């Protein structure tokens, strides 16, 4: 017999999968619209940053942390918040990324009212979209903007990320044309 916690997690995963049938999901469309960026770019970034396979489908996971280069996924926002606060007490904030867009709290923590607000999916998407828009304004190109989103200093890490983003974005466009989720 499933515990209430496992049942809740299964329900959440099902809800995420149902929402992903509309691509990009409405939250991405709204955040992208507000920042005047393509929703497909925002969704591709979230898949690249926090994507996890759920029932054979790749979905962004809102309670994802990256601490000093190691990714962690949590079943609840509360658990992720607790781990985030512990990480910030132990690590330089520049080594901590949080949420759907894996926003770096050392460089962009001021965009949130508190560290745990970075785990709010809607707020994280709004910040991610705003950052992408800023990078696009500087470059005029969404692939270059994605590379700068990952590593503003550029170099080999940004080039690798641009290549990964391009593959993710092209895969999404094929999925959208076929009407199938990623």
Predicted regions mapped to residue ranges:
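Gram-negative bacterial Sec-dependent N-terminal signal peptides
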Residues: 10-13
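N-terminal signal peptide c-region/cleavage motif recognized by signal peptidases
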Residues: 15-17
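Catalytic glycan-binding domains that act on GlcNAc-containing polysaccharides
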Residues: 21-182
């Amino acid at each position: 017999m499933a515990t209430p916690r496992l049942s809740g997690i299964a329900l959440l995963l099902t809800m995420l999968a149902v929402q992903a049938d509309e691509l990009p999901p409405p939250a991405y469309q709204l955040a992208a619209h507000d920042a005047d960026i393509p929703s497909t770019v925002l969704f591709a970034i979230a898949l690249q940053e926090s994507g996890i396979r759920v029932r054979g489908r790749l979905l962004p996971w809102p309670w994802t942390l990256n601490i000093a280069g190691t990714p962690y996924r949590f079943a609840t926002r509360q658990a992720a918040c607790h781990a985030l606060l512990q990480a910030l007490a132990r690590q330089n904030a520049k080594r901590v990324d949080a949420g759907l867009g894996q926003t770096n709290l050392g460089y962009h923590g001021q965009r949130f009212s508190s560290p745990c607000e970075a785990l709010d999916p809607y707020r994280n998407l709004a910040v991610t979209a705003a950052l992408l828009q800023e990078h696009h304004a500087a470059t005029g190109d969404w692939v270059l903007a994605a590379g700068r989103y990952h590593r503003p200093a550029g170099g080999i890490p940004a080039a690798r990320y641009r290549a990964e983003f391009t593959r993710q974005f092209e895969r999404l466009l094929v999925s959208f044309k076929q009407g199938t989720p990623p």
